[in-house]
Amino acid sequence: MSKLSIKDLQLSNKRVFMRVDFNVPLDENGRVTDDTRIRETLPTIEYALRHGAKLILCSHLGRPKGKPNPKMSLKPVAERLRVMLDHAISPGQNVGFSPDCIGMQAQEMAKQLEKGQALLLENVRFHAEEEKNDPAFAKELASLCELYVNDAFGSAHRAHASTEGITHYVEKSAAGLLMQKELDYLGKATSNPAKPFVAILGGAKVSDKIGVIQNLMAKVDAIIIGGGMAYTFLKAQGQEIGKSLFEADKLDLAKQILADAHKRGLKFLLPVDHVTADKFDMHATPHQIGEGQSIPAEQMALDIGPKTVALFSEEIAKARTIVWNGPMGVFEFDNFAKGTRAIAKAVAGNSGATSIVGGGDSVAAVHDAGVADKITHISTGGGASLEFLEGKKLPGVEALTNK
């Protein structure tokens, strides 16, 4: 990686500002209900503390719209982190909590930090200046520290004060261990993948994935399309899709993508059979529409059928690199989640491939199917990984110091 890593920094006795992603769900009593995001960045936090950093942690939580909201306070996160570090590093590892991310109290608490101690700042989005990337606000954040580390890949596609602006006012900015892992895996997949390279794209809308499809077409050997977006392509081929979701304004583009794939000799796989229902409802009765059959006018496709699962799985089994983003059906309805779960198992079953899974539903599916430990890399950033796969530059990465 051409950017500085935390391992390139002399951390001992330095005040280090680390942007992390602690955007975790809280229950109505303010307790953390899923600490996955905290766990994922623990190796970076532990590395910094073991190397004598005076660590200042910064994150957002939820969308407080630029003003303080006690329901989105990071205080419960500080308490959870305290417990986790107790187990990981040493009993009594204190994590301070500053009730604001700027101002006199934050300054004072940062100055009082000793080697190997951590301070968590209150939700950075309690200030509207964060999302506006306000230079004065970024400068105030930077005044707390000497070095900057970004371990929040999930926010790397945002040019905010704590992800981009701050880097203009610190001596050095480096990637954390989690950020580096993301960039290494996604970078290799897009620049030097082991072949055959198969991309699996799902989700509701073609419009969300156009950039990814167009960028990956030049790199992959096969593209597999599932989910609602597949029906825009099937409609573009002249197939009867009943009441299935499709984007009328994207039909011409879908035709163009299909023609381009054909011209490149690229495999472009679409569903050949379907699981449908008469309404978009979790309790709707599933119907099987076999290969070669049209979807009836009153039915809508909500999942891929067994023939499609077999077709897609056969292609996945040949791959040496797999990137998967987006579900194959309405994954949140149990009756229409089978296709997505089957694809999760197919991806996990190819032990000879490097597999990268991103996006909420795809990640949920690999956990749900009990195969998360068989996936090479589960990406922590849905939007950021998509923009990376589109070939876009991520502001939070570009801002880091070059090696």
Curated annotation (Swiss-Prot):
The keyword Disulfide bond does not apply. Belongs to the phosphoglycerate kinase family. ATP binds at residues 209, 332, 359-362. Substrate binds at residues 21-23, 37, 60-63, 125, 158. Monomer. CDD domains: Phosphoglycerate_kinase. Its main location: cytoplasm. Pathway: Carbohydrate degradation; glycolysis; pyruvate from D-glyceraldehyde 3-phosphate: step 2/5. Pfam families: PGK. InterPro entries: Phosphoglycerate_kinase, Phosphoglycerate_kinase_CS, Phosphoglycerate_kinase_N, Phosphoglycerate_kinase_sf. Keywords: ATP-binding, Cytoplasm, Glycolysis, Kinase, Nucleotide-binding, Transferase. One of its GO terms (molecular function) is ADP binding. It comes from the Bacteria. One of its GO terms (biological process) is gluconeogenesis. The keyword Kinase applies. It is found in: Cytoplasm. Its EC number is 2.7.2.3. It catalyses: (2R)-3-phosphoglycerate + ATP = (2R)-3-phospho-glyceroyl phosphate + ADP. It comes from Koribacter versatilis (strain Ellin345). One of its GO terms (cellular component) is cytosol. This is Phosphoglycerate kinase.
